[in-house]
Amino acid sequence: ADYIDEDVLAEFPEWYKEQTGEDIEVIYQVFDINEVMLTKIERGHEDFDVVCPSEYIIERMIRKDMLLPINRDFGNTPDYIPNLSPYIQDELNKMSQGDKKVTDYAVAYMWGTAGTLYNTEVVTEEEALECANLWNPKFNNKILMKDSYRDCYGLAIIYANKDRIEKGEVTVEQLMNDNSHESIAKAEEQLKLMKPNIAGWEADFGKEMMTKGKVWMNFTWSGDAVWAIEEAAEVGVELDYVVPIEGSNVWFDGWVIPKYARNVKAASY
């Protein structure tokens, strides 16, 4: 529910009518994880007009011909794509499928990292920086993991290959995109070993548990971490966030129009 400013949702119908002369109602729905949204569209043919999945889901939707190209020539609102960070633009371009450019199907919205949110009273920065400490028995039942397959898989496969990363034999990007049976088995093994330390798999309740001191570390997204740090500070709890020194996932979210959309015009706006 924190993903879009409520004022934007409230003001959009009025702005849309100014632009088009047409009335519209915004029905806003959120999903805990990307895969739930994808299943509703792919199998249930849900007629969402516009959705905002992460980069790996966008890539999959383009590959499966599930998206409509976006008409960028509309209204009086300038398209910000030409001013996009070169780094983000390069990363987005990697998701293109053959002659299908990702920028024809997606508009970048947010980006960030996956890392460790930690309580500075009980966890040092040095401990938070090392992936190995998420497996440390010292933190038995004191760690939350984001309920995200890609991020948990990434953490586990990076940790399993940390020596190879240090030697320069493999990159984090290569590991994140390796879905071989061997790599999946390695990640599964590491996640099983981590199980005694896991207090829960969270989609949205991590901020509350960290603020109340029920857990000490949360492997989460940078956006959620910032929100949690601000909320915790209001009640005198000091939290901080770091990206593991071994490396981690960089995520991108973007707006796309599913092919089952009923109001493509409004979705483009």
Located regions from the model:
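Early extracytoplasmic/lumenal segment of secretory-pathway proteins
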Residues: 1-64
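Hinge/lid segment of periplasmic solute-binding proteins
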Residues: 38, 59-111, 125-130
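Hydrophobic residues within well-ordered alpha-helices
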Residues: 41, 209-211, 257
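Alpha-to-beta junction loops
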Residues: 43-52, 66-68, 139-141, 212-220
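A bilobed periplasmic-binding-protein/Venus flytrap-type ligand-binding module shared by bacterial periplasmic
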Residues: 115-122, 158-159, 251-263
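Short helix-loop capping/hinge motifs at secondary-structure junctions, enriched
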Residues: 122-129, 161-168, 261-267
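Ligand-binding pocket segment of bilobal, Venus flytrap-like solute-binding proteins
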Residues: 142-148, 152-156, 164-240
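Extracytoplasmic/periplasmic substrate-recognition and gating elements
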Residues: 220, 224, 231-269
